[in-house]
């Protein structure tokens, strides 16, 4: 990779970003699903910064227990502290830990990059929550052995001994979490019932010759609940016809969109890859949001691409935008690409096409406030 590395340095020349590192990852037998997602996360700057901060504050703890997050922090630190600007790194410790922890990733079979991303983010959240709880328990034990709180110098007994626990919000939530609101309107009494739910990514159904904007509109389209799908209205105290729609109540800072390219075909009894052409813009305006976030804008910075004609075989690569340059990561290989090359990964407008490189997971960063 020395030649390829020097080629990349030559291509960037004096435009090589100060302090940045572009390293390919070694493949340990079908670990491209992991490599492509890790590259996208490394170039998700807020995620990288938090992880490096975590590494710095934890490396002094001699008896720190190894977990997936410490292995990931170690890998990111290894990349960022390289003396060389380009090269190849073997994420061996991380991959070994992943396989040890989850049997799903143990085989040499083709794995799903979206499943891996989901698992990784949820695992990091679990680790951070456990650590936050342990710190809180330690703090509470040392600060007070009495179950009573002190307010203005007076002891205030807790109501019936009930402690209201606030949910722990980690930095992963601050970066990736958004809130969806599910609105259901009873067609008899017009009462609107709203139910909120959080998300770390949005999985969108796709159609041929469509765009992310139209997929998002479909995601938020109004659905009528009738016949056996009637809605139980609390006000009418009975099953009623209703209209239901999903909107984004709070958009995340980093919006991750998963395109549902693998569809189960009943007649075939198996999954099929949808190679549909779905345009994903470099700048995205969200229109299915609730005030005050109307028309919040996002900029694309990474794409995980699935290469291949079927769901059970193929390859994953990633496209990453770093300091206004677009880079193509294919395991050990890293090269510079033109921004216009991104559109070659939209998909195919014909059913059968020689182009099998399709955008699968998209990473967008908010250009405005989402807090």
Curated annotation (Swiss-Prot):
The keyword Translocase does not apply. Disulfide bonds: none annotated. Its EC number is 3.4.19.12. Constitutively and ubiquitously expressed. The active site is at residues 32, 315. A motif (Bipartite nuclear localization signal) lies at residues 83-100. One of its GO terms (biological process) is proteolysis. It catalyses: Thiol-dependent hydrolysis of ester, thioester, amide, peptide and isopeptide bonds formed by the C-terminal Gly of ubiquitin (a 76-residue protein attached to proteins as an intracellular targeting signal). This is Ubiquitin carboxyl-terminal hydrolase 3. A lipid is attached at residue 2 (N-myristoyl glycine). Keywords: Hydrolase, Lipoprotein, Myristate, Nucleus, Protease, Thiol protease, Ubl conjugation pathway. CDD domains: Peptidase_C19G. Signal peptide: none annotated. Belongs to the peptidase C19 family. InterPro entries: Papain-like_cys_pep_sf, Peptidase_C19, Peptidase_C19_UCH, USP_CS, USP_dom. It is an enzyme of class 3 (hydrolase). The keyword DNA-binding does not apply. GO terms for molecular function: cysteine-type deubiquitinase activity. Residues 23-367 form the USP domain. Pfam families: UCH. PANTHER family: RE52890P, UBIQUITIN CARBOXYL-TERMINAL HYDROLASE.
């Amino acid at each position: 990779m020395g030649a390829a590395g020097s080629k990349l340095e030559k291509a960037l020349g004096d435009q090589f970003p100060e302090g940045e590192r572009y390293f390919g990852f070694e493949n340990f037998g079908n670990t491209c699903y992991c490599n492509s997602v890790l590259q996208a996360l490394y170039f998700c700057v807020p995620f990288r910064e938090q992880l490096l901060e975590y590494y710095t504050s934890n490396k002094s703890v001699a008896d720190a227990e190894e977990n997936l997050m410490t292995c990931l922090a170690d890998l990111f630190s290894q990349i960022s502290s390289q003396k060389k600007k380009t090269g190849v790194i073997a994420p061996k410790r991380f991959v070994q830990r992943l396989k040890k922890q989850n049997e799903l990733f143990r085989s040499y079979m083709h794995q799903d990059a979206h499943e891996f991303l989901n698992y990784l983010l949820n695992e990091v959240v679990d680790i951070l929550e456990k650590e936050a709880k342990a710190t809180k328990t330690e703090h509470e034990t040392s600060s007070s052995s009495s179950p009573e709180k002190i307010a203005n110098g007076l002891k205030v007994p807790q109501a019936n001994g009930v402690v209201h626990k606030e949910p722990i919000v980690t930095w992963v939530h601050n970066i990736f979490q958004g809130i969806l609101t599910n609105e259901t309107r009873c067609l008899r009494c017009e009462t609107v019932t709203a139910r909120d739910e959080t998300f770390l990514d949005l999985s969108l159904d796709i159609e041929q010759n469509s765009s992310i904007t139209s997929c998002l509109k479909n995601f938020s389209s109004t659905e009528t609940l009738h016949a056996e799908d009637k809605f139980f209205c609390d006000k009418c105290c009975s099953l009623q016809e209703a209209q239901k729609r999903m909107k984004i109540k709070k958009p995340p800072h980093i919006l991750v969109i998963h395109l549902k390219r693998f569809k189960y075909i009943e007649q075939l009894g198996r999954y099929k890859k949808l190679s549909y052409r779905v345009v994903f813009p470099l700048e995205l305006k969200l229109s299915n949001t609730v005030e005050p976030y109307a028309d919040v804008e996002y900029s694309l910075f990474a794409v995980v691409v699935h290469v291949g004609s079927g769901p059970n075989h193929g390859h994953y690569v990633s496209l990453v935008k770093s300091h206004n340059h677009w880079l193509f990561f294919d395991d050990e290989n890293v090269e510079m690409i033109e921004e216009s090359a991104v559109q070659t990964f939209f998909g195919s407008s014909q059913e059968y096409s020689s182009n099998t490189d399709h955008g699968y997971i998209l990473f967008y960063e908010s250009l405005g406030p989402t807090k």
